[in-house]
Amino acid sequence: MGKLQLRLLKHTDRVELDHYLRLYSRSFNPDERVSTQILRWVIQPSPARVNPVHLFAAYSDKQLVGGACTLVLPMFQVVFGSYIFVAPALRGRGLGAKILREVLRQERKGVHGWNWRLYGEVTASSGDGWHKLLARAGFRFFKKMWPLASYQHPNRIVPGRLCYFNFRRPPERFSQPALLTYIHALFYGPETMHRHLLPRLKHFVKLEA
């Protein structure tokens, strides 16, 4: 395949966005994918939206081969990498690693690149190979289970692992417990966060950096 190109989509890129969201939907099981309606909504510019969402489309020879979705959290100087995906028919060719490297490069270019960090989640459906690839790329994993709530069945918990990558150095005055409770409540709702994350939060308090 040709050289990989990663493009940041805008809400006005209607055709490209339609193709992206169809591939995104095919790449994740219902428990782990947020609805495409929500993704369409959150990439629309709004003065009230303080946490920008980046939808990156990955192309090779003008063919859409995968993508990524990140959430930028200026309050915590963090980028949260919610999704990286490759077209099912093209997996096993190293495209996931190329997309990951390009996401890190592009997020590092921004004004936040000096001292921000990027977080990511993995689950059993990510595959052991993806876990190992992230570790080789420089991501560090927390030892304890990270509880992801199912988007299809809110009372179901999907066991995951949380990891992070430092762009340069840790942010100043960084509060990891506040960040993780905020992210969990944002993604899954306050009730789920109180029920499933707070009892485990002590395992994520110590900054492993």
Annotated model-derived regions:
Residues 1-43, 57-59:
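Short amphipathic alpha-helix that is part of the acyltransferase structural core
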